[in-house]
Amino acid sequence: MSANAFGKLFTVTTFGESHGPAIGCVVDGCPPGLEIAPEEFSHDLQRRASGKSRHTSARREADEIEILSGVYEGRTTGTPIGLLIRNTDQRSKDYSNIAQQFRPGHADYTYWQKYGIRDPRGGGRSSARETTMRVAAGVIAKKWLKQRYGVLVRGFLSQLGEIRPAGFDWDAVEDNPFFWPHAAQVPELETYMDALRKSGDSVGARVDVLAGGVPAGWGEPIYGKLDAELAAALMSINAVKGVEIGDGFASAAQKGTEHRDLITPEGFRSNHAGGILGGISTGQAVTASMVLKPTSSLRLPGATVDADGSVVDVITTGRHDPCVGIRATPIAEAMMALVLMDQALRHRAQCGDVGEISPRIPGQVDV
């Protein structure tokens, strides 16, 4: 009804606001018997967390997960899994001066128009704080996918402003606060972000996410297409303004002889389609990209109106990310994992009796 839940068989419902006492989620549809412990959530939650470097928001939350239900003696029971994280570092006073003002480029105005009431503290429900629980739910999905099917979901920052990676190394991604795949460029990113922060401005970014090991057959035509649901999932992340599957918009400049992924008994010779054809996985890596707009909460004055319709200049003094894309990689990974787990369970429910289909084409091969 009010779109706080996600998924069909494997569902996630989140609740809470940025400056409320807690945020949480209910994960339903997880098969029983999956081993899970509170400490397993820490890694991805800390990857998403702010306050880990000078290039993100200074807000520091412990993000300690509490498992309220659905787990007994360290294993899922098949019943709803309740997860809770208590907020501990709110500074609501930072928003007292703009409580009646609509920040340009922010959800303040649209929430006001929809509900006639809004929580101005940290953006309330529209804050990216909500994505903490998506990442928590994603921990469950990632683990189940890896154990059950060998699927590995991972992502990286593929553009910061106008800067693009000059090389690629997965090992470098987890060794810097940007999730950047080329270690030699990290000093350049730091210099760029230092100058941006001093200027009081913000910048956009792009994140790439992929899942390797996805079997052929996941996804439902026509309205439950894997790429359609993946695009919707990524678009639901705060500040995302565009999503591509595979080559995405670059496909407009390609010819059919270039874009089609030729098939051989040894495997596909390319993956322009992003591992999805007809809304169904091909067995190749599922690849997607998302673009995030620049943060709208700035220290630089901007023209707007207040709740009375009066013209004012708004200046945001709270703690905000100069680039929300820096922390978006684990969020994108979580959303892809949630979509894949839901699709896997739906495929198993409908097609579990379908035997091995020949020929079974391996994933992409080098040419």
Curated annotation (Swiss-Prot):
Enzyme Commission number, as recorded: 4.2.3.5
Gene source species: Xanthomonas oryzae pv. oryzae (strain KACC10331 / KXO85)
InterPro entries registered for this protein in UniProt: Chorismate_synth, Chorismate_synth_AroC_sf, Chorismate_synthase_CS
Function noted in UniProt: This reaction introduces a second double bond into the aromatic ring system.
Enzyme class: lyase
Gene3D superfamilies per the UniProt record, alphabetical: Chorismate synthase AroC
Record-level GO cellular component terms: cytosol
GO molecular function, one term: chorismate synthase activity
Descriptive protein name: Chorismate synthase
Necessary cofactors: FMNH2
SUPFAM superfamilies, A to Z: Chorismate synthase, AroC
Entry binding sites for FMN: R125, S126, S127, N238, A239, G278, K293, P294, T295, S296, S297, R319
Reaction catalyzed: 5-O-(1-carboxyvinyl)-3-phosphoshikimate = chorismate + phosphate
Annotated segments matching region Disordered: 39-60
Pfam family, one: Chorismate_synt
Subunit: Homotetramer.
Keywords attached to this entry: Amino-acid biosynthesis, Aromatic amino acid biosynthesis, FAD, Flavoprotein, FMN, Lyase, NADP
GO biological process assignments: amino acid biosynthetic process; aromatic amino acid family biosynthetic process; chorismate biosynthetic process
Pathway as given in its UniProt record: Metabolic intermediate biosynthesis; chorismate biosynthesis; chorismate from D-erythrose 4-phosphate and phosphoenolpyruvate: step 7/7
PROSITE patterns: CHORISMATE_SYNTHASE_1, CHORISMATE_SYNTHASE_2, CHORISMATE_SYNTHASE_3
Gene that encodes it: aroC
Similarity remark: Belongs to the chorismate synthase family.
Note accompanying the cofactor annotation: Reduced FMN (FMNH(2)).
NADP recorded as keyword: yes
Entry binding sites for NADP(+): R48, R54
